[in-house]
Amino acid sequence: MRIGTRWLSYDIHGKLRIKSNVVVVNQYFLSSEAREVPDLVIYVGDFDHDRIQELFDEKLSVVYRRGGVLRSKVLLAGLTGRTILLASTPSYRLLRKPGKRLRALIKAVIQIKLIQRGLTYVHSACVCRDSSAAMIVAPPETGKTLTALMLTRSGYKFLSDDMSLVGLGRVVYSNPSPLTIHPIHVETCGLKLGLAKRVEMSLRHKLRSIPYVLLTVDEFRMSAFEVVGERDIAERARVDAIFFLEEGKEYVGELDPEEALKRLKAVGKMHRYLFENEFLQTYAYYNPALDIDSLAAREGKIYEELVEGTRLFVVRSEKRKFWRLVDSVFRRS
């Protein structure tokens, strides 16, 4: 590690403290309390692999091309306790940012640390009134973001847009990551964008409609603080209703808990990296103290509690106008 490295400290609701020299979670969790010993240290850059490796008993290390511009090395240690992840990759050396595979590994390690502390991510949006939360579940491009934003403009508080952070007891914690914004969000929600942002959004939206080009152009994103406002972001609430969105003729119906659990597990784990990560599976092979099945069971318990204690609904609507139905049902339930 280099002397003078600029470190970022994160505190995820007092459950997980991270120290990293690269951005690993959204800015909402940035903390100035650097005195606390971190649960997870992440360092991306050059390091003395052999020297550091000697310090740990429980570890997994991979080294490719020890010399040259394309050299790559990773060391992961202490995954069942205080954890350190060190990585040096060509993408960071050349572009100063982690590549796709390394980003996936970082996210997977963070997910393990959260599950160990009784939390997990669910691919969903969440809003709340007082301490009662509505979880909005749907595949991508169905209307979760639009529904959450419109409900926020109707007096609800915002908790999350794409990935909800949920714990035991159906507690959902704020996770206001940057929002993907499309023209429909601007038009329907009345979002006020400056000229530069409006042009950028329109250009990105058009480019991503072209086959193959979309693979090279990122979606237009805005901070949740810009879109929603800090005062309208709640810290936590309890999930009391889950709404499964579907496109179709307007309809609201209750859902059986068994079917709801299957749906929640199917769509709720989208954009997840944990149990399919080959590096972590190999780590578990060499370090049996990391019990993957036990982690999956802990996560499963959180999912089961969500459907056992809440009201469950299928909501269908055309043109993504789900928010009126969700609002009406949630106020009654």
Model-based region annotation:
Residues 142-144:
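Conserved glycine(s) of the Walker
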Residues 1-140, 153-154, 165-333:
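A noncatalytic interaction/capping subdomain that flanks phosphate/NTP-handling catalytic cores
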Residues 146-157:
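A conserved segment at the C-terminal end of the G1
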